[in-house]
Every structure is written in structure tokens, then in C-alpha cells.
């Protein structure tokens, strides 16, 4: 599901029910989320926004997922329709799946329910193969460094900080020093935070009236890059690679050993290679 992250869209709703959340760069230095719901649902999720071409690269590794969004520019929609993704454009549906909560205004007022969507399209997609490997302990032999926080300055709009909380064994999400909380007051957190460095470039398509070009990234055609995996209060330096659209992304240590995740929810930060990520130890 495509969820907005523009400052006016905050606080969001329903993200804590997602199994995996991808944060992707889009035009103008802002980011958006692709939230994966499989094990759990949410009665309200949003606000839901438009698709981007990068979403196909993110979601192709999940087989034939149901991709919920609110429209997009025509070249992107054409690419989605010719991809393995099952398109679910909320603009084509009535209030049976679309919610417009009081106090929200366009374009930040389109919400939905995973329950309602699954009820309508229960046979549209099938459970994908796992995209991560899991273990309750840090992989034996992996070179690790204790970490207190990781800072990801996407832009002045999104200066993301994750801080490790030993009590809950999770990383808590902040914007600078301000907790990133949802509409119910719960702070976003994750058992695993993956920083996946990607080469981004600007495509030929205008995304908005101010001239913002579509942000593109190669996530699957013999793609590879640096990765940082944070779990259990440690940092694991490694690499990521992916050969085809249908293949899950592989995360390995610098020596080639598979990096496993802590059982629980995972946030994947798709970070442009020019962004300087820092950690405190």
C-alpha cells in the first residue's frame, strides 16, 4: 500500500500493522512509504497516495501483490499494468473501501482498510515466498558493532533518526529529536532497520506542476550496492544484490554470509548513495 510522508500528511495511520515498510525517495527531496500487509491488517490505513515507477521494483519480489494506491501519471500506470503487480487503484472504488476522515483535506484525506480490500479481492494474490531470512540471534561470524542510533538525512523534510531501545529490543523512529508518532500516538518502531543504498536518477516524466521529475532507481536488473542492517542494538555492514524483478533482494556480509533479520517487523530505507548516513556508538 502506498502511504504518504509529506509533512502535511503526518501523522499517518496504520503503519504499525505492516510487516515491512519501505521508505523510498520521490521528487523534491520527500519520501513515501510502501507498506506490506500480510500477517496483520489495519482497520484504517493512510493517507494513501499515488504510485511511482520505483514501486514496481520494490514489489516485484513479492510475486503478484495487490498494490493499493491512488492513481499516478500515465506512464507509471502503464508500467504497473504490464508488471506482475495486481493493480488496485482506490479512485476506481466507492466508500466501501475508501474513507475520508473528518479533519483531513485533499490530497491528504484518502484512507482505506485492509479488511475491506481483502474482502473484495481475496483471490487476487497469493502469499509470496519470504524475502528475508530470520534468526533470533545475530548471525554467527558476522562482524558487528554496537550502535545507539542511525541518522538518515533524506532532506530537510525527512531527517530520519532511528534510536535503539534496549527495553523493547527495537529501534524507535524520530525526525531529528521529535518522535515519529502515528495518529493513535504510538511511535513508529522496528525490530530491524535496513539501509539499502541505491543509485537514483531522474526519469523523463514530470510528476507534478512544479516540474518535479520521476525519481528512478535500478533495484533488480543485476543491481547491487552497500547495505547496513541494524538489529538487536548492533550494526552489520554488508551488501545487497538482486538479479531479476521476481528475485528477492539478497543481503550478505562483506564476506558473503547471509544476513538474517530478527523475527518481527522490518523497515527498509532506500537511501540514495549521495546521502551521508551516520551512526552513534
Predicted segments, located by residue:
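A surface/extracellular/periplasmic glyco- and lipid-processing/surface-interacting theme
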Residues: 3-22, 27-281
Amino acid at each position: 500500500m502506498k502511504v504518504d510522508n509529506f509533512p502535511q500528511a503526518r501523522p499517518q495511520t496504520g503503519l504499525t500493522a505492516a510487516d515491512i515498510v519501505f521508505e523510498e525517495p520521490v521528487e523534491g527531496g520527500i519520501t513515501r512509504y510502501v507498506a506490506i500487509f500480510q500477517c496483520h491488517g489495519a482497520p484504517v490505513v493512510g493517507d494513501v497516495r499515488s504510485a511511482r515507477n520505483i514501486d514496481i521494483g520494490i514489489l516485484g519480489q513479492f510475486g503478484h501483490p495487490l498494490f493499493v494506491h491512488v492513481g499516478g501519471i500515465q506512464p507509471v500506470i502503464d508500467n504497473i499494468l504490464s508488471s506482475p503487480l495486481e493493480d488496485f487503484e482506490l479512485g476506481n472504488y466507492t466508500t466501501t473501501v475508501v474513507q475520508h476522515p473528518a479533519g483531513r483535506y485533499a490530497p491528504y484525506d484518502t484512507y482505506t482498510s485492509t479488511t475491506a480490500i481483502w474482502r473484495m479481492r481475496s483471490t487476487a494474490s497469493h502469499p509470496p515466498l519470504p524475502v528475508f531470512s530470520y534468526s533470533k540471534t545475530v548471525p554467527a561470524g558476522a562482524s558487528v558493532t554496537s550502535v545507539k542510533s542511525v541518522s538518515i538525512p533524506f532532506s530537510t523534510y525527512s531527517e530520519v533518526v532511528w534510536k535503539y531501545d534496549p527495553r523493547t529490543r527495537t529501534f524507535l523512529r524520530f525526525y531529528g529529536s521529535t518522535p515519529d508518532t502515528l495518529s493513535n500516538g504510538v511511535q513508529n518502531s522496528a525490530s530491524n532497520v535496513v539501509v539499502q543504498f541505491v543509485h537514483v536518477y531522474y526519469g523523463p516524466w514530470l510528476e507534478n506542476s512544479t516540474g518535479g521529475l520521476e525519481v528512478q532507481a535500478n533495484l533488480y536488473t543485476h543491481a547491487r550496492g552497500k547495505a547496513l542492517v541494524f538489529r538487536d542494538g548492533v550494526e552489520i555492514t554488508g551488501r545487497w544484490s538482486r538479479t531479476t524483478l521476481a528475485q528477492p533482494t539478497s543481503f550478505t556480509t562483506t564476506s558473503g554470509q547471509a544476513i538474517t533479520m530478527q523475527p518481527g517487523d522490518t523497515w527498509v530505507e532506500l537511501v540514495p548513495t549521495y546521502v551521508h548516513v551516520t551512526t552513534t556508538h
